[in-house]
Amino acid sequence: GQRLSNQPIRTFAIGMESDPIDLKYAKQVADYLGTEHTEVIMNKEDLYQHLKEVIYHLETFDITTIRASMAMYILCKYIHQNTDIKVIMTGEVSDELFGYKYTDFAPNPKAFQEEASKRIKELYMYDVLRADRCISAHALEGRVPFADVDFVDYSMSIDPAKKMNVYNKGKYLLRHAFEETDYLPHDILFREKAAFSDAVGHSMVDYLKDL
């Protein structure tokens, strides 16, 4: 997208001030692509301040859901208050299509496909619902390229044997699709994935438990 644009694309990353695990990698990619990059740092007080808001908008007390939502909620609030951006793109659904923890240990391709299909059908109840509520709470609209209907249909038609984690790398097929291109630095393309809620800082979990 950046290569087709005559203006820098805005990109954003968020992390805990105590251990922002992924900020340096996001900055590396942003520099490589030439985007206009913004880092948002949150702290323990931010979590305390926004916890009730997140629970209200998500309508749940489930700690896993709340933990996975805090960073996105705070980041969307920052974008709403500090920019004129109205539409953002997110990376949800890639796990369901190409595998992650729940499919990495599938005993065979058939089991992989069954689990992936189940999670695709339940998207509206979990990750996509969570993202939609965090985004819409701040008058933003989300776009999820991986959830494009044609792309989902195509991805689910691929032989699941090609998606199996035989190289000890989650979502290997998706990584491999970009291996012969220069869209991403090679060390970023094949680094270990961290869930969004983990990537913003493991200390966030401890802070939430304190509450």
What do the predicted segments below correspond to?
Residues 184-195:
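Conserved S-adenosyl-L-methionine
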